[in-house]
């Protein structure tokens, strides 16, 4: 009994609680939620606890007590690590970590672990029965404490499920799938590619050093004087899908909650008769009301409910187990071991998602969309685009790729060569290869001339700053649906002062809607000294601190032309 209780505490603390808390805390960043993954870890936790208890019970005398107390102490140390020693933990954003900056906390953590592990062993040597009884009692107490916390995670989800109307979609079941990712229309197509974290300055370098990357981009215009909208991705992508910016006098939380509600952009595309596929891990609808989330999901062909009956066919159970256990070790082990378990969000999503092989050249329905450019490129080359008529007028696709975002694992040919074995320029060139392949397939299908393609980024290069000292410039390329003669011309460069605010009118014009309600299209922007707005985000390294508005006049790549307006939003309000 003693062994079972202590082993249950060890297993629960290190192998069950961390995955539950990590998934619940990640919210919309992960493709699967707590309701999908909980049985895997409940079963695994019980199995580990029972097997470990049986193994410990085979020991006799001093060996039994030493192993029992060590497991107890290890669990307590992990509990203390999470509770008190993880405040400086680097975020899981894929950026390489200089672990040398954490030497002090590594030393402190190591000392704390040594002390916590040593105390029960020393007491056990002197007072065996006291140490054993104390370990059992504290194990039970900490199981109860952590159990209450885990219960609260499930209670919030259960409350949401029972308060919705019987015929309504449970928003917790909504998943971004690949449905329609490799289909286009024979009638008309409007395609938006978003290359994450890709900057105009980087694109200028590629244009100069590797102009051959754009040989297939005939009929395109490259805009090299671009102001984006907002940074980082969690603000930039939703802007591209709504056209909404924070307003003077409103709380930033109110902006987040209403940006989809007050936008008609996606509705206008849908009402123009275009089937709509949106492929991103940063939709940003989770701040909206449930009714708005259901409405937006209903506009798309690929963002739809996946309940627990569907999840087993989509969830890689073994991959989920080991991926989230790796995350658990990163969180719970002492600092000296964290570099060996470092992870990033897209790695977790890819590890949890079952990669469904194409069947007879067609991607199976309801494969979950994850940010994996290498896998996307492979599927594009093997599956290839196909023409369907699922939209009355045509097809609209919004495809978010990693582009120049770290970690850098793609070479210039789009091949996955392993994490941090590449660099930003090589990886961006790899992304351009993917877009060139997409373009070539459209040309081979005879659909290039009736396809409008806009290529941008959610934001340009940036870092976590207390104050900004350099520009961040999204990229912008555009080709409208046009004559074969114009589509055969080489890519050209234009320096008009454009920004993300010109994306929505350009796309609405492309689907045949009234672009004037959104402003000027890219082609309508004149050569003038207009003021463009940009919204930067300051951070303390853990949380967003403030949203700061800038005016940009002249060349957007020159930070001397960026000036604060004095408008600031508290990102936590």
Label the predicted regions.
Residues 1-40, 64-76, 262-272, 276, ...:
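Membrane-interface soluble catalytic domains
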Residues 1-159:
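Transmembrane and membrane-interface helices of multi-pass
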Residues 58-117, 187, 197-415, 511, ...:
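Active-site-proximal alpha/beta segments of enzymes that process anionic O-linked groups
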Residues 147-181:
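Hydrophobic alpha-helical transmembrane segments in integral membrane proteins
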Residues 191-192, 207, 212-215, 430-471, ...:
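Metal-dependent active-site segment of extracytoplasmic phospho-/sulfohydrolases and closely related
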Residues 237-238, 472-476:
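Small-molecule pocket liners
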């Amino acid at each position: 009994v003693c062994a079972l209780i202590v082993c249950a505490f060890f297993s629960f603390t290190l192998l069950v609680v961390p995955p539950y808390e990590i998934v619940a805390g990640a919210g919309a960043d992960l493709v699967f939620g707590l309701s999908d993954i909980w049985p895997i870890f409940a079963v695994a936790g019980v199995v580990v606890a029972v097997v470990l208890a049986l193994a410990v019970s085979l020991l006799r005398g001093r060996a039994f007590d030493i192993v029992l107390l060590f497991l107890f102490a290890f669990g307590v140390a992990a509990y203390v690590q999470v509770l008190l020693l993880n405040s400086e933990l680097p975020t899981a954003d894929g950026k390489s970590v200089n672990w040398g900056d954490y030497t002090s906390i590594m030393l402190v953590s190591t000392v704390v672990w040594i002390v916590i592990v040593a105390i029960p062993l020393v007491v056990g040597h002197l007072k065996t029965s006291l140490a054993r009884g104390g370990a059992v009692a504290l194990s039970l107490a900490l199981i109860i404490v952590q159990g209450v916390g885990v219960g609260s995670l499930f209670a919030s989800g259960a409350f949401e499920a029972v308060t919705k109307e019987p015929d309504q979609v449970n928003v917790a079941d909504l998943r971004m799938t690949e449905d329609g990712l490799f289909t286009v229309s024979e009638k008309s197509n409007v395609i938006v590619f978003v290359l994450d974290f890709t900057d105009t300055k980087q694109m200028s370098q590629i244009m100069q050093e590797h102009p051959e990357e754009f040989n297939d981009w005939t009929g395109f215009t490259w805009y090299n004087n671009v102001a984006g909208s907002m940074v980082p991705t969690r603000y930039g992508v939703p802007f591209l899908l709504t056209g909404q910016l924070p307003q003077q006098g409103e709380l930033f939380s109110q902006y987040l909650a209403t940006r989809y509600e007050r936008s008609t952009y996606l509705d206008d595309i849908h009402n123009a008769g275009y089937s709509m596929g949106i492929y991103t891990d940063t939709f940003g609808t989770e701040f909206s009301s449930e009714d708005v989330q259901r409405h937006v999901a209903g506009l798309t062909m690929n963002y739809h409910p996946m309940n627990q009956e569907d999840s087993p066919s989509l969830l890689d159970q073994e991959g989920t187990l080991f991926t989230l256990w790796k995350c658990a070790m990163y969180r719970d082990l002492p600092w000296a071991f964290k570099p060996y378990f470092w992870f990033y969000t897209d790695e977790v999503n890819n590890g949890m998602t079952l990669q469904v092989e194409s069947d007879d050249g067609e991607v199976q329905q309801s494969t979950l969309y994850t940010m994996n450019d290498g896998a996307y490129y492979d599927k594009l080359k093997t599956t290839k685009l196909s023409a369907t008529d699922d939209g009355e007028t045509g097809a609209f696709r919004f495809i978010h790729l990693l582009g120049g975002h770290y970690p850098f694992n793609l070479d210039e040919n789009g091949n996955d060569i392993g994490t941090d074995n590449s660099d930003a320029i090589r990886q961006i060139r790899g992304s351009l290869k993917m877009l060139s392949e997409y373009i070539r397939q459209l040309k081979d299908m005879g659909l290039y001339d009736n396809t409008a393609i806009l290529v941008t980024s959610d934001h340009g290069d940036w870092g976590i700053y207390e104050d900004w000292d350099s520009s961040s410039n999204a990229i912008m390329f555009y080709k409208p649906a046009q004559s074969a003669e114009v589509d055969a011309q080489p890519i050209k460069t234009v320096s008009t002062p454009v920004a993300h605010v010109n994306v929505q009118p350009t796309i609405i014009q492309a689907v045949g809607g009234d672009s004037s309600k959104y402003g000027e299209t890219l082609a309508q922007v004149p050569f003038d000294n207009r003021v463009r707005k940009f919204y930067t985000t300051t951070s303390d390294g853990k949380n967003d601190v403030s949203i700061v508005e800038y005016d940009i006049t002249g060349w957007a790549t020159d930070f001397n032309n960026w000036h604060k307006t004095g408008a600031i939003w508290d990102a936590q309000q």
